Amino acid sequence: MLNIKWIRENQELFDEKLSQRFIEPMSSKIAMLDQEKRKITSLIQEFQHARKVKSKILGNMVSKSGEEFEELQRDVNHINEKLAELEQNLDNNNELNELLNMLPNIPDEEVPYGIDGSMNKLVRAYGKTNKNALNKQHFELGTKLNLMDFEQTAKISGSRFVTLKGDLAKLERALINFMIDIHTKEFDFFEISPPFLVRDRAMYNAGQLPKFSEESFITTNGYRLIPTAEVSLVNIVADTIIQREKLPMRYVAYTTCFRSEAGSSGRDTRGMIRLHQFGKVELVSITTPEESKNEHEYITNASETILKKLDLPYRVMLLCTGDMGFAAKKTYDIEVWLPGQNQYREIASCSNCGDFQARRMKARYKEFGSNETTLVHTLNASGLPIGRTIVAILENYQNNDGSITIPDVLINYMGGLQKITTYSE
């Protein structure tokens, strides 16, 4: 959520930043609603003070009868009626909060202006891309190996699901352990095993609700399946005040993630690129405003390191204003090279959300010995999605005979296996 005080004091700049996100000016409407809310709040405070004063006088009166007592009693009753009316008006006046809840984060000054992904900015690239036209796509390789099943899985669960078998299932498990080891041992992230089912409040805190309600799965009793472990991890600090010396707090978790892929009809209908259910290692950092810029580079480097150790070609893109996620103020996308598609595809998103999520979930920190609190900054990064990493390995490590060479760093995790070959049932 955006800072209403900042909007009040920077209306022209606020509208300019909204325009970069292709949203019409909102400052005038917000200022009007804010003024109404502040007026009601001020009246409530005045009546509460008056009630306190008169109630104290009533309590100190020796005689609990007589004209003066009855007049004061009527005044207190009248104040209670007015307070109830004003508080009801305040509860009903939700338009301001509803409007603020639908507005995305303000882009950082370093974010380039742009309409869509075609206007993102190249930051750096790693590795050499293989542009052999004979390269096969991952789903061709996986099904030919008899280790990737879409057809039978569709009978079980429908479209956008997959079953991995044998050495591909083993590769999935190896990647999870490999990624967690790197993030915990080399980057000092603390491993968490969080819940996959969360309440609406947790989704709201992370910026998933109310805007993206249709993109998540909801159970019959009101829980939602997490679209990313970011939701569970950032909420670890919801409604807390953290001592400054404990920051940064860095969390890593592997979870299954669930997405309805609403609005993705016709996109990536074949293969493992866009599934309803997928595994992902997620990174979350909680830090101070002063350190969040450096932490953004740190958490991005952690994601990049996985790809470097796997020797997968990739590039880092700074997203433009029109391509950023809702809660982010600045985002790097890491795109891995897929020779079967002859193009780069997103494999990780690394975002600095500033105090946007923290304001929603009231996550603050304070210096030792001080009572003054400040909102934390939250950051997140994919570290990485397991399915898309398997896709990248299959396409970049494919051999002419259809077998897949295991990346060197994964051989021990694969029990010494150096090559995946066709499975015969």
Curated annotation (Swiss-Prot):
E.C. numbers: 6.1.1.11
Binding annotation for L-serine: T228, A229, E230, E282, S382
Disulfides per UniProt: none
Cellular component GO terms held in the UniProt record: cytoplasm
First-listed, main subcellular location of the protein, grouped into a coarse class: cytoplasm
Pathway involvement of the protein, from the record: Aminoacyl-tRNA biosynthesis; selenocysteinyl-tRNA(Sec) biosynthesis; L-seryl-tRNA(Sec) from L-serine and tRNA(Sec): step 1/1
Pfam families assigned to the protein according to its UniProt record, in alphabetical order: Seryl_tRNA_N, tRNA-synt_2b
Compartments, as annotated in UniProt: Cytoplasm
GO biological process: selenocysteine biosynthetic process; seryl-tRNA aminoacylation
Keyword field: Aminoacyl-tRNA synthetase, ATP-binding, Cytoplasm, Ligase, Nucleotide-binding, Protein biosynthesis
Alphabetized CDD domains for the sequence: SerRS_core
Binding site for ATP: R259, S260, E261, E346, I347, A348, S349
GO-annotated molecular function: ATP binding; serine-tRNA ligase activity
Residues spanning the membrane: none
Catalytic activity as recorded in UniProt: tRNA(Ser) + L-serine + ATP = L-seryl-tRNA(Ser) + AMP + diphosphate + H(+); tRNA(Sec) + L-serine + ATP = L-seryl-tRNA(Sec) + AMP + diphosphate + H(+)
Biological function: Catalyzes the attachment of serine to tRNA(Ser). Is also able to aminoacylate tRNA(Sec) with serine, to form the misacylated tRNA L-seryl-tRNA(Sec), which will be further converted into selenocysteinyl-tRNA(Sec).
Family membership: Belongs to the class-II aminoacyl-tRNA synthetase family. Type-1 seryl-tRNA synthetase subfamily.
UniProt-listed NCBIfam families: serS (TIGR00414)
Free-text note regarding domains: Consists of two distinct domains, a catalytic core and a N-terminal extension that is involved in tRNA binding.
The name this protein goes by in its record: Serine--tRNA ligase
Gene designation per UniProt: serS
